UniProtKB/Swiss-Prot annotation:
Enzyme Commission designation: 2.7.13.3
Gene of this entry: ETR2
Membrane-topology annotation of the record: Multi-pass membrane protein
Miscellaneous: Plants over-expressing ETR2 display reduced ethylene sensitivity, delayed floral transition and reduced seed set.
Major location category of this protein: endoplasmic reticulum
One GO CC term on file: endoplasmic reticulum
Localization terms from the record: Endoplasmic reticulum membrane
Family according to the record: Belongs to the ethylene receptor family.
Modified residues (4-aspartylphosphate): 692
Induction of its expression: Induced by water deficiency.
Pfam families listed in its UniProt record: ETR1_N, GAF, Response_reg
Organism: Oryza sativa subsp. japonica
Name of the protein this chain belongs to: Ethylene receptor 2
Length: 763
């Protein structure tokens, strides 16, 4: 598409050229049809001239009719809104000129008045349109001149855009170089590899002759040449270090921008060596440490800088421009970041090695602790077994003695011995649990017992203790005490003995008083020491208070101060082996309370125990009594053939006597292998096996499985196990091994008879 000014100039000259033929045709039309006969013949005759004019008018008319179509197409295809009106005027003018030429074709021959009238009208309209077009074109000329000015302005803007595009291309090229350098630098996390990669890539990008890195010394007094791209042929020892107070060094470290060094700079001369070189530039690089990235309050630390020196060749074709210096600055920042990451990685690796060493030490210490704990537990278990087995034997023998005929006084003493031995066995179990499992939790066994019998046995034991100590003893028991209550009989008996032992240990001479009575909690509510926790009993309950008082004689004083209370733990304050705090926890577990009150004169001290017991109104059958020891009739298994397996000689002998007391025919063996061999003989007709679960060579579970497997085709004998604990784990293993019954040690005559009776009845 041609420019707009040239187009309108062409349209204007076309209008002038087309107007002249129309005027000539109009003038010549006056002699149309006349021939003076003076013209020469041939081609220039009047007829030929008229025919040529007629053909010319037709061609001109056709051309005039086609030009408006082209102008209309141009106006619709181009965005010339202010100029569309003049285009339409030119189109109308050209159409009228073409119409004038078309009508003129009919004036070269004789014509009618209508032809002349049409020609006149066409010429008149052509004159009006041409005049209007000329006026419009006159106002359009300034706009066409402004278009020329705008064209020059656009050319200037195009040149500026070309310069900006060139600058953007150069910046993009610099950014590409920086990205490439950054990518190469960050490929490694080793500081030496990072520095060498930086020097190599900068040398390729900037066409350097040499590149060097100066690091501060450990003392911080000088800069040392540590890395360089090309080794110097001859090096002076003094050129390898530069003082820290060198002007160039100070100036470089003072700013983050790159600096072009002078030709006589000591830093530049030392970096290029003996070779001739071109301009030299240098920039600082922060040497960050991992400690700078730790959280918390930032510490004031002096920043350490390295210096990167870049040397150009001597040919003079290259120099340090803004783009090159900008690339160097960006690369220096990236190198500082990469070096900081490397420092963090090195410190984390050192920390990981330290943690690994500490972890190994902890594992070693844990292993040693585990071995020590196992050794301690083994020692405690052995010590516990050494104390428990004789106690179990004594309890078994005493249970047989209870079946003998004795007078009431002997019966009371025997029951007290049994009760004391049972409490001692329970205490040994508690000590073993708390020391092995490392906890202070004790379980309670709530069952129905005779409160009157417990008080009588406690009085009997206290009388023995006070008699051995040489202290007088008196007691008073309320007649309203219920006979049958529900609670932990062993724990209550132990707490009472603990209270007595604590007081008589503090006294050398005096009188010990024991008072047991019931009390009304509502009447004593004003006393805060009596406040008890409400027990979750389904039925009625009773509150019982045990009050033990010691009165020192006038000639002796209490060994402890009157202000001393029993609230703190003291290993020597209990004759039975448990501290006062442990007793207090046991009392709180039974919904009770225990406290002490001292006399203001220091001559007496009182310990009071308040407990809640659930009442049992129905008296149980003697055969189903829940007491640990009883005097009810023992069942007799006359002729029952029993094999007894126990590796402990004393317990085996006691259990053998108990079985014989029950009327059994007993064969005792010392190991599980002997038991299995006994069943191998054809004469073996044992109906019952009583075995200990904790034997040395072969435990009771394996023996039971072997017996079941060995007698698989025959009717297997019944098996009753003896165990120190009867928790759910032991019961599950007994059920898996095919054991029919389980008796918890110590084995007494009543417990053994009841369990054998139950097993024989169920099987």
């Amino acid at each position: 598409m041609p420019p707009i000014p040239s187009l309108w100039i062409r349209v204007f000259f076309s209008w002038l050229l087309l107007s002249l033929p129309a005027a000539a045709a109009a003038d010549f039309s006056h002699c149309g049809g006349c021939d003076d006969g003076d013209g020469g013949g041939g081609i220039w005759s009047t007829d030929n001239i008229l025919q040529c004019q007629r053909v010319s008018d037709f061609l001109i008319a056709m051309a005039y009719f086609s030009i408006p179509l082209e102008l209309l197409y141009f106006a619709t295809c181009s965005d010339l809104f202010p100029l569309k009106w003049i285009v339409l005027q030119f189109g109308a003018f050209i159409v009228l000129c073409g119409l004038t030429h078309l009508i003129t074709m009919f004036t070269y021959e004789p014509h009618s008045f209508h032809v002349v009238l049409a020609l006149t009208v066409a010429k008149f309209l052509t004159a009006l349109v041409s005049f209007a077009t000329a006026i419009t074109l006159l106002t359009l000329i300034p706009q066409l001149l402004r278009v020329k000015v705008r064209e020059n302005f656009l050319r200037i803007k195009a040149r500026e855009l070309d310069r900006e595009v060139g600058m953007m291309k150069r910046q993009e090229e610099a950014s590409w170089h920086v990205r490439m350098l950054t990518h190469e630098i960050r490929k490694s996390l080793d500081r030496h590899t990072i520095l060498y990669t930086t020097m190599v890539e900068l040398s390729k990008t900037l066409e350097l002759q040499n590149c060097a890195v100066w690091m501060p010394s450990e003392s911080g007094s000088e800069m040392i040449l540590t890395h360089q791209l090309r080794q110097m042929e001859t090096e002076d020892s003094n050129s390898l270090s530069i003082a820290m107070d060198n002007p160039d060094v100070l100036e470089i470290k003072a700013t983050k921008d790159a600096k072009v060094l002078a030709a006589d700079s000591a830093l530049g001369i030392a970096s290029r060596g003996k070779l001739e070189a071109g301009p030299v530039a240098a920039i600082r690089m922060p040497m960050l440490k991992a400690s700078n990235f730790k959280g918390g309050t930032p510490e004031v630390m002096e920043t350490s800088y390295a210096i990167l020196v870049l040397v150009l060749p001597e040919d003079g074709s290259l120099g340090w421009g803004e783009e090159e210096l900008e690339i160097v600055e960006v690369v220096a920042d990236q190198v500082a970041v990469a070096l900081s990451h490397a420092a963090v990685l090195e410190e984390s690796q050192l920390m990981r090695e330290k943690l690994a060493a500490q972890h190994r030490d902890l594992l070693r210490a844990k292993h040693e602790t585990t071995m020590a704990t196992e050794a301690r537990n083994s020692f405690q278990t052995a010590m516990y077994d050494g104390m428990r087995r004789p106690m179990h034997s004594i309890l078994g023998l005493v249970s047989m003695m209870q079946q003998e005929n004795m007078n009431p006084e002997q019966r009371l003493v025997m029951d007290a011995i049994v009760k004391t031995s049972s409490v001692a066995s329970t205490l040994m179990n508690d000590v073993m649990q708390t020391s092995t499992v490392n906890r202070e939790y004790l379980s309670l066994v709530r069952r129905a017992f005779n409160l009157h019998s417990l008080v009588k046995e406690a009085i009997s034991v206290v009388r023995c203790l006070t008699g051995c100590k040489g202290i007088d003893f008196e007691f008073e028991v309320d007649n309203s005490l219920p006979e049958r209550v529900v609670g932990d009989e062993k724990r209550v008996f132990h707490i009472v003995l603990h209270m007595v032992g604590t007081l008589i240990q503090r006294c050398n001479a005096g009188c010990l008083s024991l008072y047991v009575n019931t009390y009304n909690e509502k009447e004593e509510r004003h006393n805060q020491d009596w406040m008890l926790r409400r027990a979750n009993f389904s039925g009625s309950y009773v509150c019982v208070k045990f009050e033990i008082r010691i009165r020192e004689s006038r000639g002796n004083l209490l060994s402890s101060s009157s202000s001393r209370r029993l609230q703190g733990p003291n290993s020597t304050s209990s004759e039975m082996g448990l501290s006062f705090n442990m007793c207090k926890k046991i009392v709180q577990m039974m919904n009770g309370n225990i406290w002490s009150v001292s006399d203001s004169k220091g001559l007496g001290e009182t310990i009071m125990l308040a407990l809640q017991f659930q009442l049992q109104h129905v008296t149980p059958v003697s055969g189903a009594s829940s007491d640990l020891f009883r005097s009810a009739p023992i069942p007799n298994f006359n002729g029952l053939q029993v094999i007894l397996v126990d590796s402990d000689d004393t317990n085996r002998a006691v259990t053998h006597k108990l079985l014989e007391k029950l009327g059994c025919l007993v064969l005792s063996v010392t190991s599980g292998i002997q038991c299995i061999n006994s069943f191998a003989s054809a004469e073996s007709s044992f109906q019952l096996v009583v075995l200990d679960l904790t034997m040395r060579t072969m435990d009771g579970f394996d023996v039971a499985l072997a017996i079941r497997k060995f007698r698989g085709n025959c009717w297997p004998p019944l098996i009753v196990a003896l165990a120190a604990s009867t928790d759910d784990t032991v019961r599950d293993r007994c059920q898996q091994a095919g054991i029919n019954g389980l008796i918890q040690k110590p084995v007494t005559l009543a417990a053994l008879g009841d369990e054998l009776y139950r097993v024989l009845q169920n099987n």
